[in-house]
């Protein structure tokens, strides 16, 4: 995925930040979908396709389904908690950073940064 396309998706996403994180779904082995409720009330998924040769990201409406299938997906589900407070890209690089605030609860989850490197092979 080209840096300009990533920039366009992030620009659209920034209009909705901070966005409430309503949970993760894993429709495929190489895909994570984070259900978000944006600042405007819009409900959408931040969909990350992270498996080469064509990693990408997109904003999609509706609710996607799927349980974690790999240890990596189980780690994502355990650590990506709290509102999405920032989405950024360095220059027009093919790397995107998503900062989540974490959450307080029975077991506190610290803030985390999810990095998507959409460079392919």
Model-derived features with residue positions:
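Gly/Gly-Pro- and Ser/Thr-rich, intrinsically disordered tail segments characteristic of DNA damage-repair
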Residues: 1-121
